[in-house]
Every structure is written in C-alpha cells, then in structure tokens.
Amino acid sequence: MLKDLIIKSVMLSLLLIHLNQGLHGQDNLTKPNEILVNKITSLDGMISLWKFSEDPGKERRASGKGEFPLKESNGMVPRINEGPLSGYSILLDGTKHLTLSHSETGLLNIYGDRNEVTVIAWIKWTGEQTGFVGGMWNEYKDGGKRQYGLFISLPHYNGRDQVCGHISRTGKPTPPFPYSIDYSASGQKVPANEWCTVAFTYDGKYIKSYLNGVFEAREPELINNTAGFEGYPNGLVQSKNPYYFPDGMGNNGSDFTVGSVLLKSGMGNFFKGQIGGLAVYDRALTENELKTICYLK
C-alpha cells in the first residue's frame, strides 16, 4: 500500500510539473517558449509583443499589429541569454532606456473616454528603486504628457514595491496635488531578483494591478502625502486596487518608452533589472486571461 501511495505521489508531482510548464512557462529560461508566446499572441486585442531577442545596437521590434521599433537611448542596451519568452532579455542598468517617438506610436496611442488598455511585462527587477516598465508617459514636457504606463514601486502615494498602473486624462498632475495620484497599486509586493509577470488593466472605469496574474483588492486607506491640501485637511482616503478613474485616457502626445520616463530633471524613474517581454492590448484582459500568460517558475 505504501508503495502504491509513493507511485501515485510521484505521478501527481510529474503531472503538476507538466501542467505548470504547459500553462505558464518552462524552467529552462535560455530557450524560446513557443507555448507561452502563442498564448500571448492568441488573445484578442493584442497590439504588440516585444520579446527582446535582438542583439545590442539593434532596434527592438514587436510582433502584432506593427513592429514599433524601439531605439536605444544613452548607449547600447545589453542582451542577456535568459528570458521567459524568447530565451533572451534586455538588461537595464538604471541609465539606459528604449524609445519610440510619438509620431511612430500608431495603434499604441490608445486614448478616449471608454477605451481600454492592458500592459503586461515579464521582468526580473532588482528591487532597488522606482522603475518605469513601459507605456506612454511623460511627466514634464509642456506641463506633462502622461497617458498610460506600467511602473514598479511608486511609494509617494502608497505603491512601494508594488505593481502600479498609471492612467491620465489631462497629462498633468492631479489637482490639488503636485504629482499624478491616479494609479492602482497591487496588494502584493514585487519580488526582487526573481522572474515574475506584472500587469495592469484599465476598462474605462477602474485601473487594476496584477502580480503573476493575481488581483488582490485593497481596502480604502489613507494615502500618504495628501494631508493639508485644499479640500483634504486630513488627507485622502481611497482604494488603490482597484483604483476608480472614470475620466478616460487623454491623447497627450507622449513618446512610447521602456525603462524610463521624462521628468523635470531629465530622464528618470529608471527601471533596473531585466525585461524579457512586454505586451500591449487595446482592451482590459480578465484575470483568467492574465493567468494563462504568466510565467511562473
């Protein structure tokens, strides 16, 4: 009887390993994962998927509804022989980023009262600092050209070490505060130095942040750095996940960037770590859909 139990236990373990690889990824991060890539590209609404398999010095091109070639900025961006999609990833050291000029954004320029968006990325973050992963976000030029963007760790308004999804209608800070406060922040912390899947969705009403395909709601809470402003003597109380934002996205003229955004002081909010894939959809994916395209070790 004990022998039968051992055999059944081993068989169950092998089955779970097989299912995990089939649904989410593979343990060998140095080879292309076509199963996962096919799942990503088969979902309706995909505009672009960058797998970052190109050599340093080359434009990083997407598959989908356009190539959207991302150019290196401030030097060559190294390629690492490790990644959950193509077997490769870009390594960002906190000084470099990739960029696509606004005139070339095309279908990536998502805006409107009821339009939706999903940004999802497969990353290994160092855990050191605020990092912009990707989107159309510019905090300085002409008063700000914010639109949509995926960040890791925005501590000023209760998003430290969390997946943050930023949306803006006006492109400018949120009155009466000095910065834009309109972002969701996941209930979970993003692990440092570990491959994971980070995403946010916006359905025209709510912004939601996900870690590894899982949405964790947050109860209403007092938001840091909001007390003493006009209308908020004791500070603002709100939920960060989901974040209520019915205003829609503005057509604000930002470039599409990966790894950094333009601040008053120049490029900043540099992502440090590896990015093995980045995808944009023109609709809000469901939690079940996001779970099917996560990489879980």
Where are these regions (language model features)?
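Extracellular glycan-associated modules
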Residues: Q26-N74, I80-K297
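Bacterial Sec-dependent N-terminal signal peptides
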Residues: M1-T30
